[in-house]
């Protein structure tokens, strides 16, 4: 849903060792915090549900995890990630990189927790077509993980909100006539 509960970890260091382990479905995130989707420092005009008051001058990034269950993936026609962000992010679906904005590197190249993002202002959500990645989805449990970054640890502007949207089509349907 639009404002579902996510697990998150403040980016004061790498989220795991090795640095990519946190992206896995079976990663133990029991010590991570929980917050409603829509994360921000709380300054400016973005009234996000989860406020990160301690972020400025302390940590430059945020690690996010959201598990979700699908009964059947065969009916999914389209898959779109709607994301509004300030400043950059990398998103992974079931451990595979599916989108990167404002952060240097090649696909699936790990991004250090303290990497600066290019400056980008929120307010114009981007729709990213993930149809090429819908085969990554499995019947049962799946996970969307995101590493969201600020432009600098000193910046007092940070915001991140994401939704994964699927168009499900069932049919064709045949009705019996009497």
Language model features by range: what are they?
Residues 1, 74, 84, 136-139:
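Extracellular/periplasmic catalytic domains that process cell-envelope and extracellular macromolecules
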Residues 1-13, 168-178:
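Boundary/junction segments of secreted and surface-exposed precursor proteins
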Residues 6, 32, 60, 68, ...:
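Aromatic-lined ligand-binding clefts that engage carbohydrates, nucleic acids, or primary amines
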Residues 9-16, 26, 38-40, 72-74, ...:
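Acidic glycine-/aspartate-rich tracts in secreted/extracellular proteins
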Residues 25-65:
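Surface-exposed, low-complexity/disordered Ser/Thr/Gly/Pro/Asn-rich loops and linkers
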Residues 65-75, 132-136:
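Extracellular and analogous surface-interaction loops
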Residues 84-89, 96-98, 162-171:
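Short edge-strand/loop segments of extracellular domains
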Residues 104, 114-178:
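An acidic-aromatic loop/edge-strand motif
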């Amino acid at each position: 849903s639009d404002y579902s509960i996510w697990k998150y970890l403040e980016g004061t260091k790498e989220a795991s060792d090795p640095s990519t382990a946190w992206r896995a479905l079976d990663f133990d995130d029991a010590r991570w915090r929980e917050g409603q989707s829509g994360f921000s420092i709380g300054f400016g005009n973005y009234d996000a549900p989860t406020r990160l008051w301690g972020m400025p001058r302390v940590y430059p990034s945020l690690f996010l995890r959201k598990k979700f269950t699908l009964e059947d993936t065969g009916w999914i026609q389209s898959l779109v990630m709607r994301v509004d962000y300030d400043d950059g992010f990398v998103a992974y679906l079931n451990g595979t990189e599916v989108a990167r904005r404002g952060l240097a590197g090649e696909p699936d190249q790990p991004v250090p927790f303290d990497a600066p993002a290019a400056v980008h202002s929120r307010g114009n959500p981007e729709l990213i077509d993930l149809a090429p990645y819908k085969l990554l989805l499995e019947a049962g449990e799946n996970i969307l993980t995101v590493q969201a970054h600020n432009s600098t640890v000193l910046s007092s502007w940070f915001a991140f909100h994401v939704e994964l949207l699927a168009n499900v089509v069932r049919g064709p349907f045949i009705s019996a006539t009497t």
